[in-house]
């Protein structure tokens, strides 16, 4: 199973652990893990099948000192693409990131260094984001004479608000530290390693039931795009399926018998 999941990749380094946590590392450190066409194709391939191949959670990180510096601008410049060609490049980015957000496998992004342009768009498709003290966020497209093409107008806008996102693109404004976390660019900020914290979260999440995680990571995103009435109906429908699965009944029985772990306040 592990061989099927992790083989055949050049720009991604994959490590599937025994508990179903798969570490996915962007492996272009000399380019600050910039996203070229080949890397996007590998992201599409991996996230298209991860949920069917025993992956229970993903920790997404980057090799070297940076998470991801965004679109490979040198490749884009050398390709001298037509408008039609680049539109289809953007659509492929959307396919990769939609498979991440809606694929049903929880993704925790371990961020450090540059989370810039398309790198921020990539991070925004993860369900949880953990930043360390070196992490900085930017959307420098305005200064480069280009426009976003990987979902910043949707996901980054949802995270921090439309006008903050516009400010980042227009002015190149950089966010980092506690301010970035407070704005919603990351849910966790660590003094130490963002990877270690992401792994801690992934280990905990991987112990959840797969169908429950699938509903949390897929159904909620779909419901956000529905009217309130439709979302309420969908929530009831999904809840009916998830809350009556046999494995859930086993966990409820443990709760009823007082053998399940209790929810306690943070110490």
From Swiss-Prot:
Q: Tell me which Pfam families the record gives.
A: ECH_1
- Cross-referenced InterPro entries, in alphabetical order? ClpP/crotonase-like_dom_sf (IPR029045), Enoyl-CoA_hyd/isom_CS (IPR018376), Enoyl-CoA_hydra/iso (IPR001753), Enoyl-CoA_hydra_C (IPR014748)
Question: Which keywords does UniProt give here?
Answer: Lyase
Q: What happens when the gene is disrupted?
A: Cells lacking this gene do not grow on methylmercaptopropionate (MMPA) as the sole source of carbon. Growth is severely inhibited on dimethylsulphoniopropionate (DMSP).
Question: Catalytic site residues?
Answer: 121 (nucleophile), 141 (proton acceptor)
Please provide, alphabetically and separated by semicolons, the GO molecular function terms listed in this UniProt record. Answer: hydro-lyase activity
Task: Write down the EC number.
Answer: 4.2.1.155
**Binding-site positions, 3-(methylsulfanyl)acryloyl-CoA:** 31-32, 69, 71, 73, 118, 144, 149
Q: Which reaction does it catalyse?
A: 3-(methylsulfanyl)acryloyl-CoA + 2 H2O = methanethiol + acetaldehyde + CO2 + CoA; 3-(methylsulfanyl)acryloyl-CoA + H2O = 3-hydroxy-3-(methylsulfanyl)propanoyl-CoA; 3-hydroxy-3-(methylsulfanyl)propanoyl-CoA = 3-oxopropanoyl-CoA + methanethiol; 3-oxopropanoyl-CoA + H2O = 3-oxopropanoate + CoA + H(+)
A Gene Ontology biological process term: protein hexamerization
What's this protein's family per the entry?
Belongs to the enoyl-CoA hydratase/isomerase family.
| Record's subunit section | Homohexamer; dimer of trimers.
What functional role does this protein have? Involved in the assimilation of dimethylsulphoniopropionate (DMSP), an important compound in the fixation of carbon in marine phytoplankton, by catalyzing both the hydration and the hydrolysis of 3-(methylthio)acryloyl-CoA (MTA-CoA) to acetaldehyde, CO2, MeSH, and CoA.
- Protein name in UniProt: Methylthioacryloyl-CoA hydratase
Source species, please?
A: Ruegeria pomeroyi (strain ATCC 700808 / DSM 15171 / DSS-3)
Taxonomic placement: Bacteria, Pseudomonadati, Pseudomonadota, Alphaproteobacteria, Rhodobacterales
Q: Which gene encodes it?
A: dmdD
């Amino acid at each position: 199973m592990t061989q099927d999941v992790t083989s055949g990749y050049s720009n991604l380094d994959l490590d599937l652990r025994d508990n179903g946590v798969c570490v996915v590392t962007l492996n272009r450190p000399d380019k600050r893990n910039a996203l070229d066409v080949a890397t996007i194709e590998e992201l599409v391939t991996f996230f298209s099948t991860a949920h069917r191949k025993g992956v229970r959670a993903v920790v997404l990180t980057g090799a070297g000192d940076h998470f991801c510096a965004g679109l490979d601008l040198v490749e884009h410049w050398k390709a001298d693409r037509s408008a039609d060609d680049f539109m289809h490049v953007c659509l492929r980015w959307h396919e990769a990131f939609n498979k991440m957000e809606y694929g049903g496998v929880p993704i925790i992004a371990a961020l450090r260094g540059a989370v810039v342009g398309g790198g921020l768009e990539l991070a925004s498709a993860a369900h949880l984001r953990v930043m360390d003290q070196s992490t900085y966020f930017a959307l420098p497209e305005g200064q480069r004479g280009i426009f976003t093409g990987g979902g910043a107008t949707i996901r980054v806008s949802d995270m921090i608000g439309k006008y903050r996102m516009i400010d980042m693109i227009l002015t190149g404004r950089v966010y980092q530290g506690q301010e970035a976390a407070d704005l919603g660019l990351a849910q966790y900020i660590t003094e130490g390693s963002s990877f270690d914290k992401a792994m801690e979260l992934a280990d905990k999440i991987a112990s959840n039931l797969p169908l429950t995680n699938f509903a949390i990571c897929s159904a909620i995103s779909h419901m956000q795009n529905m009217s309130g009435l439709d979302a309420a109906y969908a929530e009831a429908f999904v809840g009916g399926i998830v809350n009556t699965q046999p494995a859930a009944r086993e966990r409820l029985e443990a709760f009823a018998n007082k053998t399940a772990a209790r929810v306690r306040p943070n110490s």
